[in-house]
Amino acid sequence: MAVTVETLDKLERRITLTLSADELKNEVESRLKKLARTTKADGFRPGKVPMSVVAQRYGYSVQYEVMNDKVGQAFAAATGEAQLRVAGTPRITEKDGSADGQVSFDATFEVYPEVTIGDLSALEVERVTTEVTDVAIDRTLDILRKQRRTFADRPQGEYAVDGDRVTIDFEGKIDGETFQGGKAEAFQFILGEGRMLEAFEKAVRGMKTGESKTFPLAFPADYHGADVAGKEADFLVTLTRIEAQNLPEVDAAFAESLGIADATVDGLRADIKKNLEREVKFRVAARNKQSVMSALEKVATFDLPKALVDNEMARLVENARADLKQRGIADADKAPIPTEMFQPQAERRVRLGLTMAELVRANALSATMEQIKAHIDEMAQSYEKPEEVVRWYFGDQQRLSEVEAVVIEANVANFVLGQAQVVDKQLPFDELMGA
């Protein structure tokens, strides 16, 4: 069939769809007859309800359904004939003055842009690498020891020091009034681990069991408790118990308690290094991928379909609402979230998505099943029962699709790094893990 396409804007198009009125009428009658076989109505046997009753009950909804189906089919056929890649959902409006026996509609829609990728060899992309050092292994060992430490009461008269578990009663007042969350009994925390404000810990450090102390404390302006943020309180603290920590020795017994196959100190350190290297690999890949994505924005300039940007903005708003709900914000569903605030982020995501899709298409960068399985196997190694994790991923197509997307992004990143001017940078372990 001949399809006439009007260009309304850079990406906006319009086509006219013409349907046969008789064809629409016949389809409506056919569907109503099918419904009549199962329609029930008082005073009539099943399947014997008059067509006039069936039409009165279902006529409007069936007409709407048929019109939607036929217009959708005609639109798909017309855009396929014209070889148009439709972005978003078309706006359909009925035209006046159609010829006898016909019903005409205008379909207005956007098409995907022609994505042209610039010279990748002109890009400068930073690629980081990170080594797992003995210092990082030692720090992990310290964490493991603390997870398995025990505590014992300090002798009467000894001072509280960092690493001790202290039990206190406290009451804080602002302008002479106790504030919410400012009073507790038998409250425990470990000195020096940053659970409490530094000024609070400093006051408790050096106290003895049974000792009481009063001191002022200024809450930071960005303190998570909005009622006290930026205010000064007066605290009364009584220290009721001090327990010194006992850290296990790093020896074969400690390695065995952790389930290390090679239950030696060297075996334990090797196992820690392997796990840290796995985590470093994922973090380095994520950081390098981000560098690639930022660079790609410089070589991909094209118009964006408004429909895709609008859809992405709506998705980001829903994500923001979900985040508010998770934080326990009341009436998160009704919270006024301006859609426009997400427009720059949505435009960037759409642009990157279209750019990556073109790179994947033009350079055969789709994920293979071997790559997907290898990625899942590698992730599973950080769990106690890797085989169960693998089965969990392969048991759901949505989860597999998520892994596939990650692998495709990695393929694109590696391809771009192979084409661009790469600036290698050694990133300290702490900086990578703190990112």
UniProtKB/Swiss-Prot annotation:
Broadest EC class assigned to this enzyme: isomerase
Domain PPIase FKBP-type: 163-248
Main location: cytoplasm
Reactions catalysed: [protein]-peptidylproline (omega=180) = [protein]-peptidylproline (omega=0)
This protein's GO CC annotations: cytoplasm
This protein's UniProt keywords: Cell cycle, Cell division, Chaperone, Cytoplasm, Isomerase, Rotamase
EC number: 5.2.1.8
Keyword Transmembrane helix assigned: no
Similarity field: Belongs to the FKBP-type PPIase family. Tig subfamily.
Domain writeup: Consists of 3 domains; the N-terminus binds the ribosome, the middle domain has PPIase activity, while the C-terminus has intrinsic chaperone activity on its own.
Task performed by this protein: Involved in protein export. Acts as a chaperone by maintaining the newly synthesized protein in an open conformation. Functions as a peptidyl-prolyl cis-trans isomerase.
Protein name: Trigger factor
Organism annotation: Leptothrix cholodnii (strain ATCC 51168 / LMG 8142 / SP-6) (Leptothrix discophora (strain SP-6))
Gene: tig
